């Protein structure tokens, strides 16, 4: 291993060791006994009026996935835009094909009604 990467190696293993140590300590040092106050009603002393688990519409998850897809698109476009001056013609066509695939996917989602909130 060259000396250029030794600091990254040390940082990685140090972070790994510290996180494992904290997880290990949290399991053994925490007070895990449940008492009456923790299991009692929480809505101003009354019994709960409804189930605490609220149901989310599936469309929220769909919008979150679409956001992640287009967020990843931006993540790929920023490095490409910085390296465009040193890139070749192949790089331009590769990103053009990437954008076309994403655009076709977006049009497909739009026509299937994935973006409609009926």
Curated annotation (Swiss-Prot):
Q: Which Pfam families match?
A: Oxidored_q4
Q: Which residues cross the membrane?
A: 5-25, 62-82, 87-107
**Coiled coil spans:** none
Protein family according to the UniProt entry:
Belongs to the complex I subunit 3 family.
Name the HAMAP family for this protein. NDH1_NuoA (MF_01394)
Where in the cell does this protein reside? Answer: Mitochondrion membrane
Q: Which InterPro entries match?
A: NAD(P)H_OxRDtase_bac/plastid, NADH_UbQ/plastoQ_OxRdtase_su3, NDAH_ubi_oxred_su3_sf
**What functional role does this protein have?**
Core subunit of the mitochondrial membrane respiratory chain NADH dehydrogenase (Complex I) that is believed to belong to the minimal assembly required for catalysis. Complex I functions in the transfer of electrons from NADH to the respiratory chain. The immediate electron acceptor for the enzyme is believed to be ubiquinone.
Q: Which GO terms describe its cellular component?
A: mitochondrial membrane; NADH dehydrogenase complex
- Judging by the UniProt lineage, the source's domain of life is Eukaryota
Isomerase among keywords: no
Gene it is expressed from: ND3
Alphabetically, the GO molecular function entries are: NADH dehydrogenase (ubiquinone) activity
- Keywords on record: Electron transport, Membrane, Mitochondrion, NAD, Respiratory chain, Translocase, Transmembrane, Transmembrane helix, Transport, Ubiquinone
Write the protein's name. Answer: NADH-ubiquinone oxidoreductase chain 3
Membrane protein topology class: Multi-pass membrane protein
Presence of keyword Protein biosynthesis: no
Look up the EC number in the record and give it.
7.1.1.2
Reactions catalysed: a ubiquinone + NADH + 5 H(+)(in) = a ubiquinol + NAD(+) + 4 H(+)(out)
């Amino acid at each position: 291993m060259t000396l250029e990467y030794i600091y990254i190696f040390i940082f990685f293993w140090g972070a790994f060791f510290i996180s494992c140590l904290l997880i290990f300590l949290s399991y053994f040092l925490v007070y895990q006994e449940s008492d009456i106050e923790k299991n009692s009603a929480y809505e101003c002393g009354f019994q709960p009026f409804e189930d605490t688990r609220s149901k989310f519409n599936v469309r929220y998850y769909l919008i979150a996935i679409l956001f992640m897809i287009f967020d990843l698109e931006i993540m790929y476009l920023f490095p490409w835009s910085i390296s465009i001056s040193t890139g070749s013609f192949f790089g331009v066509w590769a990103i053009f094909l990437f954008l076309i695939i994403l655009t076709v996917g977006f049009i497909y989602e739009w026509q299937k009604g994935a973006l409609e909130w009926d």
